[in-house]
Amino acid sequence: IKKKWFCPKLAKESAKAKRFKGVYLPYWTFDAKTETEYRGEYGKDRTVRNGDKEETVTDWYPTKGVYRETIDDELVCATTNHNQSMLQGLEPYRTEENKSYKPEYVAGFAAERYAVGLKEAFQMAKESIKFKLREAIESKIRTEKNADHVKNLKLSTRYYDVTYKYLLLPVWISSYKYKDKVYQFMVNGQTGKVSGKTPISIPKVIICLLYTSPSPRDYAASR
């Protein structure tokens, strides 16, 4: 927690992790080719004069097309025993470095069995992929049409050549105590990335707000 500026100094000095617990957590990962038909509208802004004032007007145009993308290692967590946002904070993993399972790899560590099945996991993966495809298509439209806005975007995606892998990924779990409250954190056993909650120093937050908030003079100057 040394890098957490808002964390109280005393917490940094007194925080001592309890025994680390090493565990292999279950994940599904999916590869697929996608083909997405899309249609929507893009807008271009222009400035017009209305009397003594200038106004921005947006002209809207229809657009449609097909977007293709290959999805590689879309990761879905298959455990329900841990805080999901904390687990997401550990990503990404270097899934391209996975190895075929051997009992000796997990010897001495706990290994959880999946709680999210393959079918459910693929639906979750598709929701995540859909979000990424929407962002990519919006960016494509803005670039190709030199557009300022995109709206009413509708997607229809087909998946083919879908493959999956079942992975056990290494995580270290621990916690520390500060002012009678226990704070849990996790460490990505592959990359060392840390995820978890830390206490907040209210005085530090106030100082930050005072330094970043505009002064009355700033408000007056901006009018």
Where are these regions (language model features)?
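Conserved small/polar residues in nucleotide/adenosyl-binding loops
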Residues: Y211-R217
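Charged, low-complexity helical/coil segments in non-catalytic cytosolic or luminal regions
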Residues: I1-K177
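Extended, hydrophilic extramembrane loops/domains of integral membrane proteins
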Residues: L169-S195
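Juxtamembrane/start-of-transmembrane alpha-helix segments at the extracytoplasmic/lumenal side
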Residues: T198-I207
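Flexible loop/turn segments at secondary-structure boundaries
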Residues: E37-R39, K181-V182, K193, P203-K204
